[in-house]
């Protein structure tokens, strides 16, 4: 069924197809039809971040930016869902066209630029949803907020989403917001993490529960830079790291139509780079922080590869676009077949 739907959707522009898919998945969720789209994955419970996941395969942020189809995605068998990236104020994102398919490489290039309806809209959608599984909310800064004041945007979003999130992801690694990736380094990272940690403690006292914080990083750092980030996360008391966001590299798409478009590359070509980052993090962290792996999972074996590299959970996005909900069960089955899970 999904193969036919994909053929029809791929006749549309990528962004139109994306918007229509969100509408259809949302409608299917309201009608309870999405459970029919693919066999449910086997139960493979895992406890991470003090949360109980029915399986370790989640939806990565970016697909449902505004939380418009939470119930729909919740019926597809994901072990958890991450929505966003959301910013304090609504913003249109970058000029179109800004989303490109590279089907020959099972890849996508995007330069969306955090287009979203703002945190208040997202929260209204979260509160209207019936989904009661693990829900991550991914937060970012507005385009027109200077990088030196980015912490204000992150704290604003954290304040607002805290009560409704199972965990919160801080996105400092999108390549499509100028200057954002500079927050991954040095004093900028240290100051951001310190502010987030202090606000997390304040909010935990206010709300009577501690919501974990995850930091999402890029795949384009050197091993030394990744090691420094890992040390900073441990020192600041962060709860998890998501590895990785999209890459600025173009290995694997050279010469393909749209292969030279500006933006972040996701899908199969980023897989090895992302998995390498997971391995470096695992070596540096030594189990002190769980790793959520994302990047290039287009087959079940790729999800198992991430777990074997040291991740506790995985997320899919581009692979879901190309393979549909069947990839969820395929990934869960492949992870279940590992001789030992981390």
Swiss-Prot record:
GO terms for cellular component: cytoplasm; plasma membrane. Its main location: membrane. Keywords: Cell membrane, Flavoprotein, FMN, Membrane, Oxidoreductase, Pyrimidine biosynthesis. GO terms for biological process: 'de novo' pyrimidine nucleobase biosynthetic process; 'de novo' UMP biosynthetic process. FMN binds at residues 61-65, 85, 138, 171, 216, 244, 267, 296, 317-318. Its EC number is 1.3.5.2. One of its GO terms (molecular function) is dihydroorotate dehydrogenase (quinone) activity. InterPro entries: Aldolase_TIM (IPR013785), DHO_dehydrogenase (IPR050074), Dihydroorotate_DH_1_2 (IPR012135), Dihydroorotate_DH_2 (IPR005719), Dihydroorotate_DH_cat (IPR005720), Dihydroorotate_DH_CS (IPR001295). Pfam families: DHO_dh. It catalyses: (S)-dihydroorotate + a quinone = orotate + a quinol. Pathway: Pyrimidine metabolism; UMP biosynthesis via de novo pathway; orotate from (S)-dihydroorotate (quinone route): step 1/1. Substrate binds at residues 65, 110-114, 171, 176, 245-246. PROSITE patterns: DHODEHASE_1 (PS00911). Its cofactor is FMN. The active site is at residue 174. Binds 1 FMN per subunit. It is found in: Cell membrane. It is a peripheral membrane protein. Catalyzes the conversion of dihydroorotate to orotate with quinone as electron acceptor. Belongs to the dihydroorotate dehydrogenase family. Type 2 subfamily. Monomer. This is Dihydroorotate dehydrogenase (quinone).
